[in-house]
């Protein structure tokens, strides 16, 4: 054990000290006083300045800081050498400060006490090498590691389950092919070759405290010959809705398989936990290279899964253990959100589960919270909130402003922050505020009063434009009354219809008399017809027609 004292060391500085004056006595002084603590082993070591002085012994005392109760340090009383082991001292608390003092003795003469600086044993302790037990398979080595210290160790009593172990392994024939792995107290090293000698060494670590121990002695072991029944390989486990599917590869047919699992926390506890492996439901004596088991048979957490094969020749070794995290296999779908404007300065947001999520009942297995992000549609500045509720309100918003919202579901208290992808973005406009309503009313009233005025102005403008650019083709009535109807009427008559004087040659007087009478009658009729025509606005050419008739009759008389 003393060979390991070159690590963590507490230096106890001692000054020059002298035995009581006596004739011929030499001055003695201890030098380089050191304390080494490895696990529960305590060592005190120093150098003597004068080895020529005989019959000099050394003794040490200790006390808990502040108690003023010095006790003899067991194992370090009247020591003739320059080192002592005081591991037998029963310390009740390794986190309390301890004071040490040491002196030289020669017969009845003693030096004065020299005290060293107080120290805390736990802080000065070094992690020692673990004990290792090996067992060989054809392609693997089984490790059984005991934590540093004894079973009843007080130094690591609170840390026995916190140790992690680092293994360096190599083929005995070639130390250049080293490989380092981190293992649990009960673990396996895989991917080895049959019938090969492998050597390894192990050291323990407390990672949270950043403390690394020293390596164990080197252990060597031969792997066995190749097993007749090979082990299954490439273990995989997948989640599919409400079930888990366990798959593996196997090169031969006509084999049956068995699968087991172990809660991961057993791996951290030192000791043999082979009896803690449990049979996976629906995965015993299966003939296919997969098996299916329901989600509800497993509680939330991390498991290790292993498979082995059996046939007429025997049973294989267990396959390589596969870590299985139920949380990592859980599929969380994005939520469905709806947004509604409540007032001019708030929006109501409702978060619901998608149909896929409802079918998988994820929210029943794991409590969910929602990460909600919202922002103004015209801005990239986002605000993020976490909500356990599925209905909540965003207050203190701007009126008549468009806000956009998206959300995702997270597993509550999950260290890996596992969650779904974000939902579709939904945008909604807030309602108008009181000021906006007032301006809306004023604007509406102004528009109602302005419309008639605008219509009137436009109509007047159109009249002016029409009068200037599109005048009427008919002259005004004041001008038209100066024009008589007769000239206009005559202008419209054709040349053939103009009035002419007609001359007749009369040979028979009796006929003339008849004609005159007839003319008188016609004249009266003509006047009446003319008056009637003037009243009605129509004109008749009846006199001309009558004349023409008479002229037609005269030739008949002539012919007689």
From Swiss-Prot:
Question: Which cellular compartments is it found in?
Answer: Cell membrane; Late endosome; Lysosome
Q: Where is this region: Important for interaction with TYK2?
A: 492-501
Q: Give residues with lipid attachment (S-palmitoyl cysteine).
A: 464
Where in the sequence is Phosphoserine found? Answer: 496, 536
Q: PTM details?
A: Ubiquitinated, leading to its internalization and degradation. Polyubiquitinated via 'Lys-48'-linked and 'Lys-63'-linked ubiquitin chains, leading to receptor internalization and lysosomal degradation. The 'Lys-63'-linked ubiquitin chains are cleaved off by the BRISC complex. Phosphorylated on tyrosine residues in response to interferon-binding: phosphorylation by TYK2 tyrosine kinase creates docking sites for STAT proteins. Phosphorylated on serine residues in response to interferon binding; this promotes interaction with FBXW11 and ubiquitination.
Stretches of the chain found on the membrane's Cytoplasmic side: 459-560
Example GO molecular function term?
type I interferon receptor activity
Q: A biological process (GO) annotation for this entry?
A: cellular response to interferon-alpha
Q: Which UniProt keywords apply?
A: Cell membrane, Disulfide bond, Endosome, Glycoprotein, Isopeptide bond, Lipoprotein, Lysosome, Membrane, Palmitate, Phosphoprotein, Receptor, Repeat, Signal, Transmembrane, Transmembrane helix, Ubl conjugation
SMART domains per UniProt: FN3
Annotated TM spans: 438-458
Residues of the Fibronectin type-III domain: 126-226, 231-329, 333-433
- Position of the signal peptide: 1-24
Short name of one Pfam family:
Tissue_fac
Covalent cross-link site, Glycyl lysine isopeptide (Lys-Gly) (interchain with G-Cter in ubiquitin): 526-527
The way this protein sits in the membrane is described as: Single-pass type I membrane protein
* Glycosylated residues (UniProt): 47, 55, 85, 109, 172, 254, 313, 377, 434
Locations of Polar residues compositional bias?
Answer: 529-540
Q: Give GO cellular component annotations, separated by semicolons.
A: late endosome; lysosome; plasma membrane
What intrachain disulfides are recorded?
76-84, 199-220, 283-291, 404-427
Q: Which residues carry this modification: Phosphotyrosine?
A: 467, 482
On assembly, the entry states:
Heterodimer with IFNAR2; forming the receptor for type I interferon. Interacts with TYK2. Interacts with STAT1 and STAT2; the interaction requires its phosphorylation at Tyr-482. Interacts (serine-phosphorylated form) with FBXW11, the substrate recognition component of a SCF (SKP1-CUL1-F-box protein) E3 ubiquitin-protein ligase complex. Interacts with SHMT2; this promotes interaction with ABRAXAS2 and the BRISC complex. Interacts with TRIM10; this interaction prevents association between IFNAR1 and TYK2.
Q: What does this protein do?
A: Together with IFNAR2, forms the heterodimeric receptor for type I interferons (including interferons alpha, beta, epsilon, omega and kappa). Type I interferon binding activates the JAK-STAT signaling cascade, resulting in transcriptional activation or repression of interferon-regulated genes that encode the effectors of the interferon response. Mechanistically, type I interferon-binding brings the IFNAR1 and IFNAR2 subunits into close proximity with one another, driving their associated Janus kinases (JAKs) (TYK2 bound to IFNAR1 and JAK1 bound to IFNAR2) to cross-phosphorylate one another.
Protein's UniProt name:
Interferon alpha/beta receptor 1
**Its gene?**
IFNAR1
């Amino acid at each position: 054990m003393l060979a390991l004292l070159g690590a963590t060391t507490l230096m106890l500085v001692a000054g020059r000290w002298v035995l009581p004056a006596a004739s011929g006595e030499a001055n003695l002084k201890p030098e380089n006083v050191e304390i080494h603590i490895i696990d529960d082993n305590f060592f005190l070591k120093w150098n003597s300045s004068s080895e020529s002085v005989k019959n000099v012994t050394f003794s040490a005392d200790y006390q808990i800081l502040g108690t003023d109760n010095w006790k003899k340090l067991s194992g370090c009383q009247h020591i003739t050498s320059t080192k002592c082991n005081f591991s037998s001292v029963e310390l009740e608390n390794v986190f309390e400060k301890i004071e040490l003092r040491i002196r030289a003795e020669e017969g009845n003469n003693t030096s004065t006490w020299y005290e060293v600086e107080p120290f805390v044993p736990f802080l000065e302790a070094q992690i020692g090498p673990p004990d290792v037990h090996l067992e060989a398979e054809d392609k693997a080595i089984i490790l059984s590691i005991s934590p540093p210290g004894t079973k009843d160790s007080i130094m690591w009593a609170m840390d026995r389950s916190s140790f992690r172990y680092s293994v360096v392994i190599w083929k005995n024939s070639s130390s250049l092919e080293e490989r380092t792995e981190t293992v649990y107290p009960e673990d396996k090293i895989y991917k080895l070759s049959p019938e090969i000698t492998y050597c390894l060494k192990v050291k323990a670590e407390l990672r949270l405290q950043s403390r690394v121990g020293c390596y164990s002695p080197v252990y060597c072991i031969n792997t066995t010959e190749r097993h007749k029944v090979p082990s299954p390989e490439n273990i995989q486990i997948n989640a599919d809705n409400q079930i888990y599917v366990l798959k593996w590869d196997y090169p031969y047919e006509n084999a049956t398989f068995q699968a087991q699992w172990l809660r991961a926390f057993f791996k951290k506890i030192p000791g043999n936990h082979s009896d803690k492996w449990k049979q996976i439901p629906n995965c015993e004596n299966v003939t296919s290279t997969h098996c299916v088991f329901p989600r509800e048979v497993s509680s939330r957490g991390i498991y290790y899964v292993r498979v082995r094969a059996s046939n007429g020749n025997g049973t294989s070794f267990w396959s390589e253990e596969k870590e299985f995290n139920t949380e990592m296999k859980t599929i969380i779908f994005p939520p469905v959100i709806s947004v509604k404007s409540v007032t001019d300065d708030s929006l109501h947001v409702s978060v619901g589960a998608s149909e896929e999520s409802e079918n998988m009942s994820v929210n029943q297995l794991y409590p969910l919270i929602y990460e909600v992000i919202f922002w103004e549609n015209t801005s990239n500045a986002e605000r993020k909130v976490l909500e356990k509720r599925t209905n909540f309100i965003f207050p203190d918003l701007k009126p008549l402003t468009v806000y956009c919202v998206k959300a995702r579901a997270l597993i509550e208290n999950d260290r890996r922050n596992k969650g779904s992808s974000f939902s579709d973005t939904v945008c909604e406009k807030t309602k108008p505020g009181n000021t906006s309503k007032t301006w809306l009313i004023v604007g509406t009233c102004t528009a109602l009063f302005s419309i008639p005025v605008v219509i009137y102005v436009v109509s007047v403008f159109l009249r002016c434009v029409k009068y200037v650019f599109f005048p009427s083709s008919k002259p005004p009535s004041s001008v038209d009354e100066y024009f008589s109807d007769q000239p206009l009427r005559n202008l419209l008559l054709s040349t053939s219809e103009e009035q002419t004087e007609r001359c007749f040659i009369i040979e028979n007087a009796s006929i003339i008399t008849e004609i005159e009478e007839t003319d008188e009658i016609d004249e009266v009729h003509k006047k009446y017809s003319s008056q009637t025509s003037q009243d009605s606005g129509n004109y008749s050419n009846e006199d001309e027609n009558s004349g023409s008739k008479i002229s037609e009759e005269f030739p008949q008389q002539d012919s007689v």
